[in-house]
Amino acid sequence: MTIKKYTLLTALSVTAFSGWAQGNNTTDNNNEMVVTANRFPQPKSSVLAPVDVVTRADIDRWQSTNINDVLRRLPGINIAQYGGPRQLSSLFIRGTNSSHVLVLVDGVRLNQAGISGSSDLSQIPISLVQRIEYIRGPRSAVYGSDAIGGVVNIITERETLGSTLTAGLGSNGYQNYNGSTQQKLGDDTTITLAGNYDYSKGYDVVAKGNTGMASQPDRDGYLGKMLWLGANHKFNEQFSGFVRGYGFDNRSDYDSYYYPGSPLVDTRSLSSRTYDTGINFSNGGYASQLIGSYSRTQDYNYDPSYGRYDQSATLDDISQYNLQWTNTYQLGLGNVGGGLDWQKQTTEPGTNYLSNGYEQRNTGVYGTVQQFVGPVTLEGAIRGDDNSQFGWHTTWQSSAGWEFVDGYRLIGSYGTAFKAPNLGQIYSSTYGNRDLKPEESTQWEAAITGITGPLDWRLSAYRNDIDQMIATRGVYPNSRYYNVEKATIKGVEWTGSFETGPLSHQVTLEYLDPRNADTHEILARRAKQQVKYQLDWQMADLDWSVTYQYIGQRYDSVFDPITYAASPVKLAGISLWDLAVSYPVTSHLTVRGRIANLFDKDYEMVYGYQTPGREYYFTGSYNF
């Protein structure tokens, strides 16, 4: 795509876009609009950072049963999970920590419970997801804390009128039932309702007790329920508004350390509620959006024999208030943007091992710019955050792209980012340290993109230096959080997509060197090499999908059950294949089948925790 074409698309984007949080699909993947990169709508092809978009059609074609199964297919992502679906998981982008990933839901920061400060995406129902926008690289200058490795924006709004009912069955007693509908009330109001129920008997995620704990022969299953309700209203040609609320309740079983004579805490019960409302304004080249949001997450871990309210149980109870005002203005051959973010988090006593309730507030102000100057694209952003705990923090980033030949572009970028410590890391009587400072990073990336015949490709090389990393020091019960580590992460990444007749191909080749800058040890649970291949085609009314992933060897730790001392252990590399097929029985009814881990490979993503092995799924969907 030439500079002239996406300059025109960007110039038209402000007036063409009706809802910033939702994104927009088009038939041309390069021209589809994304909102996550710079917080204003722009064609995907005009964004200098690497961007991937997953639609609901992709999720249905791949027949993914959880968000981690979707994200593992995308470039730059490693996932470590303590077993199978709904077990605790970590998401690593380009070798950074799982706490270095900013997760948004409909453009609003996800409420994160837990002392690690990481988002556990295994708990978000896949039926809630209508679209995912995924940005690799630093984005703290746009969003503030957490966006060191990248940003994942989960969009929940159904994009088309109509109704869908789905039922599915699968291995390990898996059941899923969900439905959604979007209907017009008059000419200017749209109502959306969705619900989901899923269940699995599960399997024993630690069958042999080889994590150092005693063997606990049982099934580690889960049960989840979700409800989503929203309304959009167009007041006139300039103003529109929305209100939405959603919640989910999950219960999952896991294997935990057991001490004879004491309760066995091996059940997690997570309840999450979120309520958003907002108003959009658009007039000529100017657009503005104001959103207010409230969410509360309650995360219990307990022994079901004693109950959630026994003294052996733990509860992370966090409320989050968000207010964000976003503006963009068409200026010249590009856009300028800016806005204000305000957030308050409060905790109840007991959360993250806190003896008292605490509160943390953050106010951020930012500005962005994108301009086209002949064959050159320029991007920049700057942001300041005032945090009630650690004060003022400034981040910035800049990028430039030069289309030196029609269809080929050189890109260079540099940016700073940070991760603020959470309330548990600061105030916990067990692990806390009130002198903690934010983690900081500096990153650069050089890339070349091109369209060579049918092949649309990108080659990137990057380096990320992270300082003041937060980690525990000492052996339990005398361990504390400190700013003690540094990391240097280097990587090379090639992505390409092309079509050969009816076949659609997507390929990712990655080499990653993530190291502790002081000890030069490889960071845990990151693969140095990954190969990902997605093949989709249609034949005789059958839609086929084949997924291949090679994950190189990784390093993990095994802990002595008496001394808690850690020893390194190597996890072998693995090649995984998935096969999925769907068939439209009628114009309304589609049946789908999937085999996950086609060759029944035995592997681990976290040492000692089993993955499910080969699994079978069958689903039917009815649209009307």
From Swiss-Prot:
On whether Transmembrane helix is a keyword of this UniProt record, the answer is no
Specify where it is mainly localized.
membrane
Q: Where in the cell is it found?
A: Cell outer membrane
- Keywords for this protein: Calcium, Cell outer membrane, Ion transport, Membrane, Metal-binding, Porin, Signal, TonB box, Transmembrane, Transmembrane beta strand, Transport
Record-annotated residues binding Ca(2+) 1? D204, Q216, D218, D220, D255
Q: Which GO terms describe its biological process?
A: monoatomic ion transport
One MF term in the entry's GO annotations: ABC-type vitamin B12 transporter activity
Matching PROSITE patterns: TONB_DEPENDENT_REC_2, TONB_DEPENDENT_REC_3
Q: Which GO terms describe its cellular component?
A: cell outer membrane; pore complex
Cite the TBDR beta-barrel domain residue spans from the record.
160-624
Signal peptide positions (record)? 1-21
Q: Where is this motif: TonB box?
A: 31-38
Similarity comment: family membership: Belongs to the TonB-dependent receptor family. BtuB (TC 1.B.14.3.1) subfamily.
Main function:
Involved in the active translocation of vitamin B12 (cyanocobalamin) across the outer membrane to the periplasmic space. It derives its energy for transport by interacting with the trans-periplasmic membrane protein TonB.
Q: Which NCBIfam families match?
A: PRK10641.1, TonB-B12
What is this protein's record name?
Vitamin B12 transporter BtuB
Q: Which organism is it from?
A: Yersinia pseudotuberculosis serotype O:1b (strain IP 31758)
